[in-house]
């Protein structure tokens, strides 16, 4: 396993602009605070640039789209591209919605630092066969061999972008590196918003100067390792959700948490 540099303690309390959905915004805000940064969530086109200009990273999540939000997303993404602001785009629901898929493809022109999605979403986006329903990945879409080759090709077209593909095994692909990471637990599927949270944590690590590849590996591993520490048989949904946020604030105190990352990194 490649030696990643511990991002903690956070050097500066960065402002993370999350253009996300109403369902998971509270979890994302608390997750960002738990790592030592500050969240803001503005998706009104009349003010979106005011907040984006003050931010150190931008997270765009398509989980609850509207015409007004799309307008604001395009404005923020354009600014991020022009000002070299790190940007994460989470392609939620592109397996089902042609509007969302079209928007994500347009956002590629703004050169996001990280493009995130589950296995079905990313397969759909790059033109591979998929079985995703709604915003959920299908167990039939977990084969990575064909996807990996296509993503390597896409990284030649978008050399500054990394792909973060979540699943039972998380796949992170950049122009020069590939990671297959294996931390996590099925209990994370019990509660909504954990996938969105990975994107927000990626933005946090980008705000600290990490590359798209490093930030993606750190974010998905951090959440998964935090969850592994609290898996208790018989725990109810609300208690598990509470403990996830609790562990996000505690794990950063462990100087050796990086040693528990499972998986491989290839050059």
UniProtKB/Swiss-Prot annotation:
It holds the Pfam family HK. ATP binds at residues 116, 166. Pathway: Cofactor biosynthesis; thiamine diphosphate biosynthesis; 4-methyl-5-(2-phosphoethyl)-thiazole from 5-(2-hydroxyethyl)-4-methylthiazole: step 1/1. Its cofactor is Mg(2+). Keywords: ATP-binding, Kinase, Magnesium, Metal-binding, Nucleotide-binding, Thiamine biosynthesis, Transferase. CDD domains: THZ_kinase. Substrate binds at residues 41, 193. It comes from the Bacteria. One of its GO terms (molecular function) is magnesium ion binding. SUPFAM superfamilies: Ribokinase-like. Its EC number is 2.7.1.50. GO terms for biological process: thiamine biosynthetic process; thiamine diphosphate biosynthetic process. The keyword rRNA-binding does not apply. Catalyzes the phosphorylation of the hydroxyl group of 4-methyl-5-beta-hydroxyethylthiazole (THZ). Belongs to the Thz kinase family. This is Hydroxyethylthiazole kinase 2.
